[in-house]
A protein has these predicted regions:
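Short, hydrophobic/amphipathic alpha-helical patches that form generic packing surfaces
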Residues: 50-63, 117-124, 174-175, 233-244
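A basic, often C-terminal nucleic-acid-binding module that engages the phosphate backbone, implemented
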Residues: 207-254
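Short helix-capping/linker segments at secondary-structure and domain boundaries
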Residues: 59-69, 125-133, 179, 198-199, ...
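Alpha-helical ds-nucleic-acid-binding substructure associated with the helix-hairpin-helix region
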Residues: 79-160
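Short alpha-helical "patches" and their helix-cap loops
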Residues: 65-83, 131-143, 186-192, 203-209, ...
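Structure-specific DNA junction-binding interface
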Residues: 1-108
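Short, well-structured alpha-helical segments
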Residues: 70, 112-119, 154, 166-174, ...
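Catalytic DNA-binding helix-loop module of base-excision-repair DNA glycosylases/AP lyases
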Residues: 57, 147-201, 238
Length: 254
């Protein structure tokens, strides 16, 4: 069965006006500059690991400009760098180090669960040369590709990484500046779409199901295509509309 998304001129005008209202926001400008660049820096283990740590932390907790998560990700040097974690040989000690680091920062929910997921992901990447495959998948996206190719990479990381469902896998790719079409759909996006008049009432909890998630994302992408707006830009505009001018050049990290 095929579903045809119908987008009318009123919908298009609404999207264009909304994006225009946020285009001066520094968060939106940073998203445009990074994610719509024609060529992007190659992703290495260190950068991927840092963003994976950060995006795992954003699950089920606040991640706005003044949040504990954002403050943690702005730390320099990064407290849980790849080299630091790789230097711990014992798996249980690795879990303990991650959990203790998160606790000492303060304000991070579920430190033990996050630590366990990250340690398991480290092991998976180190075993069976999975790093080579993971980095190859990522670096296929350093030049513009189509929406289908982005989705295949998102599905790969969704299956590979512990603690990364449909939203977090796309959050990871977007945080690396690699995606234009595949976006992390959260309660902000569903609230905006429901108010916009999305044809089905959306439930943020149901987005944990990959099929439902991709159904909603298909509709979001169809709306963007008709409006000639990249999904990552509309996503940034929605995000900015909730946070106002809280994001600055110094604290923009996503």
């Amino acid at each position: 069965m095929q579903l045809s998304w119908q987008v009318d001129q009123t919908d298009i005008a609404h999207v264009k006006a909304f994006v225009a209202s946020q285009e001066g926001n520094l968060f939106v400008r940073a998203r445009v500059a990074r994610n719509l660049a024609q060529t992007k820096p190659t992703v290495d283990r260190s950068e991927f690991w840092k963003q994976m740590v950060g995006m795992r932390m954003t699950s089920v907790q606040r991640s706005g400009p003044e949040s504990a998560v954002a403050a943690f990700l702005r730390k320099n040097p990064f407290p849980l760098s790849y080299d630091q974690i790789a230097g711990v040989i014992d798996g249980s000690e690795r879990v303990a180090l991650i959990a203790a680091t998160l606790r000492s920062h303060g304000g991070i929910r579920f430190p033990d669960k996050i630590a366990d997921d990250l340690a398991r992901n480290f092991d998976k990447l180190e075993d069976n040369h999975e790093w080579a495959t993971a980095l190859a998948e990522l670096n296929n996206l350093v030049v513009p590709v189509n929406a289908g190719q982005e989705r295949q990479v998102a599905r790969y990381f969704q299956q590979l990484l512990h603690g990364f469902g449909p939203k977090q896998s796309r959050n990871l790719l977007q945080s690396l500046g690699l995606t234009r079409y595949e976006i992390p759909i959260d309660s902000r996006i569903t609230k905006w779409l429901n108010e916009f008049g999305f044809p089905a009432k959306l439930n943020a909890t149901a987005l944990a199901d990959a099929g439902y998630y991709e159904f909603v994302l298909d509709g979001f992408q169809a709306l963007c295509a008709a409006s000639e707006v990249f999904p990552c830009v509309l996503d940034a505009a929605i995000f900015a509309s909730f946070d106002g001018d809280g994001w600055t050049e110094e604290n923009t990290i996503y």
